[in-house]
């Protein structure tokens, strides 16, 4: 059987990239794919799949190494997401929100023209959020799909969370 990274054989991938892509393939085939049809049928949140992403370390793939992550870039994330999507679209789509968050508060944030005070505040927040991901297994979401959320952020959120 071919490894998942073989799908990208036309690219020069590092050993680290191959490893994380192949990990996504293995987790996808062995753990995530068997639950995909039920997740689609029930239109439910793939919580067990998130546990598998945490257990495999994929959830921290785009967290910089200095914060305890694997330090992968956007291109690597896209290849991993593609592999996850081959096994469960709901998992790949929802995991995108988490991975995007880790990228936005990482290198993308560093590219902004911020004052020293803003940089210090962002570094503090970034440290907090990366720590939650690495140490607590936190997964982040985004509110882009809320039906009543205005792009400018002027509408209230449409979801109410309840402790279960």
Task: Please place each PLM-identified region on the residue numbering.
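Intrinsic disorder at enzyme termini
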Residues: 1-16
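Glycine- and acidic
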Residues: 9-10, 35-36, 63
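Glycine-rich flavin
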Residues: 44-55, 59-164
């Amino acid at each position: 059987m071919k490894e998942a990274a073989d799908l990208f054989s036309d690219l020069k991938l590092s050993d680290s990239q191959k490893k994380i892509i192949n990990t996504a393939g293995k987790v996808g085939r062995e753990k995530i794919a068997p639950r995909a049809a039920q997740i689609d049928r029930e239109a439910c949140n793939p919580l067990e799949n998130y546990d598998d992403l945490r257990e495999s370390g994929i959830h921290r793939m785009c967290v910089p190494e200095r914060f305890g992550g694997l330090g992968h870039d956007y291109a690597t994330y896209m290849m991993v997401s593609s592999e996850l999507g081959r096994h469960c679209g709901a998992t790949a789509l929802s995991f995108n929100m988490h991975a995007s968050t880790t990228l936005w508060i990482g290198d993308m944030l560093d590219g902004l023209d911020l004052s020293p005070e803003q940089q210090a505040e962002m570094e503090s927040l970034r440290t907090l959020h990366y720590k939650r991901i690495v140490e607590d297994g936190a997964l982040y979401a985004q509110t882009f799909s809320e039906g009543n959320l205005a792009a400018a952020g002027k509408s209230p959120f449409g979801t109410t969370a309840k402790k279960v």
